[in-house]
């Protein structure tokens, strides 16, 4: 259900996001490193964010686990940082700072990579990994839909791994992101 809610929400919100982006002149203009030749709307990520968040909120309405609250808060901080950066490019330190703040929220909710290492090392690895993955996906964002497509492929594998390991919360969150990316 979470997959289809995210997919549908994103499909419904994308045309609105596209119109709003052009109306607000919230577009990426062609440049030398860009593949597109015409202005591209910059609110597609907001539609994907909305699809995933709405799906998670509907599925976990009422009494969500603290982990879900942490993921929602962190995702919101990172998404807002990206949205602000799309509107008015932020200096690298500010963009990293917003991402770092979002990922600190995850860590504060106890979300971390669990390795046979001291806990502080696990948290440091978690922060570095999340910053690295986020910026790697951000670097792919020079062609319309490329980031969403690659994110959908990787999220599919996360979903499969979570299901085979009975990690149903991770599976639900991955299904929400997958549905949103495919929308």
Annotate the PLM regions.
Residues 1-183:
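"…together with the soluble PPM/PP2C metallo-phosphatase catalytic core" -> "…together
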